[in-house]
């Protein structure tokens, strides 16, 4: 990354590309025990959160990610009541999960409390549900939390992590996925952010392989736009314990969802289940 001439620029070595934001000032910086968190004011994209030099979110476009890591899985499950979010310290995913009235409890476990505190201060719109009676915010190791989670106690596990380096490295391997598999009920769903399908298809394939080794039998990778991330295109991957799951969703419920979204719709959900040919070929779909 670099900051010069009033621009914040993140370089993405795998594709020889970069993304930049014109900034008007630096608002805050915290070095937590785990990572460096910075907040900038941009001229056109609202506030910008950076973690260890990588863009995490902006005020203007975070809704793509938060809605797509939440609503497809929640509308795919028949009746999700107990949700666990690993990571997600900015609290945007928690907010989306708790838009579903049938959810009875949502536990968010992020290792770094400072991410949440910075989000509460600079992105309060993402933290609307932090005081919801159904919400539980924990600041602990997500790997350990899932390892100790009672068997068959969770409907959906959402892994809303940073890239598979540093504090998040342990969230992308067979051992962690085995813990998720154990904690999920038979009809449970695991959903994880799975990087850019344009630049990192090999990583997505590796993730799905590790999930399969842990016992998951069916997978679906959903691509979507995310302007602030490398290549501008991102994905989440859902995994099911069921063989040959088609990931059909409750379309009528999604159409009559009763809450506002900025990107997710039932029609969009239908379309995103059909992978682009190059993704389908690479992933064997």
UniProtKB/Swiss-Prot annotation:
- Pfam families attached to this UniProt entry: Spermine_synt_N (PF17284), Spermine_synth (PF01564)
Q: In which pathway does it act?
A: Amine and polyamine biosynthesis; spermidine biosynthesis; spermidine from putrescine: step 1/1
Active-site residues, as the UniProt record annotates them: 160 (proton acceptor)
Q: Which GO terms describe its cellular component?
A: cytosol
Q: Which CDD domains match?
A: AdoMet_MTases
Catalytic activity line of the entry = S-adenosyl 3-(methylsulfanyl)propylamine + putrescine = S-methyl-5'-thioadenosine + spermidine + H(+)
GO terms of biological process kind? spermidine biosynthetic process
Q: Which family does it belong to?
A: Belongs to the spermidine/spermine synthase family.
Q: Which PANTHER family match?
A: SPERMIDINE SYNTHASE, SPERMIDINE/SPERMINE SYNTHASE
Which purpose does this protein serve, as stated in its record?
Catalyzes the irreversible transfer of a propylamine group from the amino donor S-adenosylmethioninamine (decarboxy-AdoMet) to putrescine (1,4-diaminobutane) to yield spermidine.
Name the UniProt record assigns to this protein: Polyamine aminopropyltransferase
Q: Which organism is it from?
A: Xanthomonas campestris pv. campestris (strain ATCC 33913 / DSM 3586 / NCPPB 528 / LMG 568 / P 25)
**UniProt lineage:** Bacteria, Pseudomonadati, Pseudomonadota, Gammaproteobacteria, Lysobacterales
């Amino acid at each position: 990354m670099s900051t010069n001439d009033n621009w914040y620029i993140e370089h993405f070595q795998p594709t020889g590309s970069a993304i930049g934001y014109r900034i008007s000032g630096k608002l805050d910086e915290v070095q937590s025990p785990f990572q460096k968190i910075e907040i900038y004011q941009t001229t056109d994209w609202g506030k910008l959160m950076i973690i260890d030099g990588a863009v995490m979110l902006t005020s203007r476009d975070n809704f793509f990610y938060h809605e797509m890591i939440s609503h497809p899985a929640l509308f795919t499950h028949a009746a999700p009541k107990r949700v666990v979010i690993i990571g997600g310290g900015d609290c945007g995913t928690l907010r989306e999960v708790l838009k579903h009235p049938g959810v009875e409890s949502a536990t968010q476990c992020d290792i770094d409390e400072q991410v949440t505190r910075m989000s509460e201060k600079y992105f309060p719109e993402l933290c609307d549900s932090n005081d919801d009676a159904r919400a539980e915010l924990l600041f602990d190791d997500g790997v350990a939390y899932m390892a100790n989670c009672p068997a068959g106690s969770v409907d959906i596990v959402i892994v809303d992590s940073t890239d598979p380096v540093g504090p998040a490295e342990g969230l992308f391997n067979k051992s962690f996925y085995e813990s998720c598999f154990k904690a999920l009920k038979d009809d449970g769903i695991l959903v994880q952010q799975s990087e850019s399908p344009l630049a990192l298809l090999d990583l997505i394939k590796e993730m799905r392989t590790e999930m399969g080794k842990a016992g998951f039998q069916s997978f679906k990778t959903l691509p979507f736009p995310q302007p602030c991330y490398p290549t501008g295109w991102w994905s989440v991957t859902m995994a099911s314990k069921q063989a040959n799951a088609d990931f059909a969703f409750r379309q009528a419920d999604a159409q009559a969802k009763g809450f506002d979204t900025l990107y997710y719709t039932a029609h969009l959900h239908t379309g995103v289940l059909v992978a682009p040919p190059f993704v389908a070929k690479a992933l064997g779909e």
